[in-house]
């Protein structure tokens, strides 16, 4: 397995598909990286030479934020919104959907498991 950006990418898949295993790289960015490195997108990772792998690593490290750096940036952005108490920050604090989704009947995943409301107890005669 080739190791790029501290991620083991699968050998038996096409290069474009393998690059998407790296957090922060989707299909479009993976294709863009292949074009910059002048490597065929259909080439399998196990067919790449050491020079091509080094070239891919250099392009990814120098031009893109991936893995730990990207995760840290996203976390800091969310923390900043929470600190300034903007609307999105308040939604994060309350663990509700942030981008305007309905919550009356949906958003179970974000809100957590449904809590049963205790029924009224019958009066004893």
Swiss-Prot record:
Bilayer-spanning residue ranges: none
Keyword tRNA-binding recorded: yes
One Gene Ontology MF term: tRNA binding
Keyword rRNA-binding: yes
Any GO CC annotation of this UniProt entry: small ribosomal subunit
SUPFAM superfamilies for the chain: S13-like H2TH domain
Protein origin, superkingdom: Bacteria
Keyword set, alphabetical order: Ribonucleoprotein, Ribosomal protein, RNA-binding, rRNA-binding, tRNA-binding
Pfam short name (any one): Ribosomal_S13
GO BP annotation list: translation
Oligomeric and partner information: Part of the 30S ribosomal subunit. Forms a loose heterodimer with protein S19. Forms two bridges to the 50S subunit in the 70S ribosome.
Role, per record: Located at the top of the head of the 30S subunit, it contacts several helices of the 16S rRNA. In the 70S ribosome it contacts the 23S rRNA (bridge B1a) and protein L5 of the 50S subunit (bridge B1b), connecting the 2 subunits; these bridges are implicated in subunit movement. Contacts the tRNAs in the A and P-sites.
Family: Belongs to the universal ribosomal protein uS13 family.
Protein name: Small ribosomal subunit protein uS13
Native source organism of the sequence: Rickettsia africae (strain ESF-5)
Gene behind this protein: rpsM
């Amino acid at each position: 397995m080739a190791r790029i950006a501290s991620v083991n990418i699968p050998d038996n898949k096409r290069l474009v598909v393998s690059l998407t295993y790296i957090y922060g790289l989707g299909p479009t960015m993976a294709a863009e990286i292949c074009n910059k490195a002048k490597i065929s997108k259909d080439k399998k990772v196990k067919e790449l030479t050491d020079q091509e792998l080094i070239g891919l690593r250099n392009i990814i490290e120098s031009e893109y934020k991936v893995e730990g750096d990207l995760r840290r940036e996203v976390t800091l952005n969310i923390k900043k919104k929470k600190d300034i108490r903007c609307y999105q920050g308040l939604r994060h604090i309350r663990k509700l959907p942030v981008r305007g989704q309905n919550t009356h009947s949906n958003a179970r995943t974000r809100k957590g498991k449904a809590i049963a409301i205790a029924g009224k107890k019958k009066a004893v005669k």
